[in-house]
Amino acid sequence: SVEKEYRLLYPLLKKRAAFLFEYGHILHKQQKPEESIRILMEAMKYSSDPMILNIIGKNHQQTGDYLAAERWLIRSTYRLPGRIYPYYLLAKLYAEPDFRQPDKLEEMKQIVLAKAPKIYSTAIEEMRREVKKIK
């Protein structure tokens, strides 16, 4: 498996931010949030990429630790305020049945819908379409 390959490469590449991010992201996609968090915490030593924070937040959301997810995602918005993606993730977090926060949800939806993107993409269109569906 891909995860096994990354595990074998880890001793050689454990100080490379891009490798650690990809490894952590793969673990996240494989529903292994605790392992993913551990690897991504290492990646933070070598990179200030806010995507690391976003994936850590998504991992905490997977485990049901919504307050930790919120903290990491808010931290991502501080790192690069111009990015729309962390606000989109916060909107989805605030829509979680066990963490529902209608006021914060509306605030994040408005940011996603109104914020001018630095670079327009189909991903932005998709996020905006999806956020409109969230009730």
Residue ranges and their predicted role:
Residues 18-22, 51-55, 85-89, 121-126:
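Alpha-solenoid helical repeat scaffolds
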Residues 78-79, 84, 91-120:
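TPR/TPR-like (Sel1-like) alpha-helical repeat modules
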Residues 14, 47-48, 81, 117:
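Short coil turns that delineate tetratricopeptide repeat
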Residues 11, 41-45, 74-78, 111-114:
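Conserved structural position within tetratricopeptide repeats
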Residues 33, 66, 100-102:
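TPR-repeat structural position
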Residues 30, 63, 97-99:
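Structural motif corresponding to the intra-repeat A-B loop/turn of tetratricopeptide repeats
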Residues 2, 36, 69, 104-105:
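Single-residue signature of alpha-solenoid repeat helices
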